[in-house]
Amino acid sequence: MLTVVQSFFIVCIFSSSFTLVLSSNGDRTSFFNNCLRNCERQNCSADGLEIQEQAVKYYQQTVFDKLMQWTCSDECQYGCMWRTVEAFQDRNWQIPQFYGKWPFVRFLGLQEPASVLFSLFNLLAHVRNLRKFRREVRPDSPCYKIWHLFSAVAINAWIWSIVFHARDNPLTELLDYSFAYSMVLMTLYCMVMRMLHKYSWLLKAFISLAFLSYFINYFVYITVGRFSYSLNMTTNLVTGALSALGWFLWSFRVRKQRPYYRKILGFYLLLGMSMSLELLDFPPIFWILDAHALWHLSTTFIMNPLYSFAIDDCRLLRTEKYYESVGYDKEI
């Protein structure tokens, strides 16, 4: 438990300074900005979208670049970014960041290819685990629909993670951050619904509506206002910590009756350790693989104990439900 809590607070402290890197040392340099202005003036249309005819031979976009809608201004920014990186390296300075991000080599038009690939791995991991859940758990089991809802929310979140890392713009960023939080919020919702699975449908419907209303309100807030990275990070951490705390307390209470409680503890311990990757901040290896991409890779594997827990729990809840129906009202 200490590992998870410590990781939450360490990342929370780290996030408090996150907004300071929105403008980074690379894009603040006069070298980069002069390069960008000259490039756009010489090569781009007035709106910055089209590459002028005389510059086409210098900016030969692939079909993937065009598919991802890389504009002339984007190409200038990309080229000037690498010229600035070379200038820093020639002076033996540290690799700079640009607009809060490390420089990445584009591949097939993808802005952060490793994060795209690992986000896809996460999506497939949820699909695979959901199929396993459906094979091993009967539809009439308690909490069956809740875990389906969790999978749907998670799959949607990873779809937008793929989109965002493929092409970073204000819209894809908003959707990625929003739906990533929906997945964190969903873990808290699943915990609450699991604790209340024997209560009336009216109470559960009211709580479900409260969760939905809260998420919609949060989405509207970060959409119409100025997006705050520190607020988003803190909100994720607090929500995740509440979920982890709830499961830890539940595990302590049922540790003798439900030996599979270790799986949910294992999930949160692994999650807490994986979050430490977000604290590592180094230039991308081969200009592709950075700490954030490694974090996405790590989360691919830690979903297995969570789904395994859900399978064991739903099956045992169904058995208990059967015994209750025949008059044996006792938890196994």
Model-found features: residue ranges?
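Multi-pass alpha-helical transmembrane bundles in non-GPCR membrane proteins
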Residues: 19-332
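N-terminal signal peptide
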Residues: 2-5, 10-29
